[in-house]
């Protein structure tokens, strides 16, 4: 069996298991968190609170978080989704009615997860407490994307990798550019 086929089958199996094992009450909480994060509302609100209440460090963290989020959204939704035309998980894998409310865009990668991880990872080095608080909804969003049938687990993992890369780039590119400029 090929590696690609094994990955596809594992993705399908994990999608079905995740969607069927989340209790109904938890599914509603996951959906509510995802709704708050839709169009990056949750992360923009978090940035406003950090900038308003966190002093200079809060403003730096908010700027880093929003910049990383924008980079992640561009990479995930503007580039990767356009290149990878992967269909959403089939409805028969999802044993609940939330499967009807899914985007029409490519499944790969998860833009919600990319944005959540990017914001969280960019904020955490400057304001660790805010990073820890943001990690909770970020993790819930990642689980929700699979549980709702919007994504396969590999889409979510790819989104998380894009988010981490965007945060790293946001935090390190300015220093690298300054060093190059100075030399």
Name these PLM-found stretches.
Residues 1-44, 77-105:
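N-terminal transmembrane-helix/juxtamembrane module of multi-pass inner/ER membrane proteins
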Residues 21, 56, 78, 82-91, ...:
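Membrane-interface elements of multi-pass transporters and channels
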Residues 25-26, 56-61, 90, 127-132, ...:
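Membrane-helix interface segments
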Residues 36-42, 66, 130-136:
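Alpha-helical transmembrane segments
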Residues 45, 75-76, 119, 136:
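Hydrophobic/aromatic residues in alpha-helical transmembrane segments
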Residues 49, 71, 75-80, 84, ...:
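Alpha-helical membrane-inserting segments
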Residues 50-75:
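Interfacial segments of alpha-helical transmembrane regions
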Residues 93-183:
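Membrane-embedded catalytic cores of phosphoryl/pyrophosphoryl-handling enzymes
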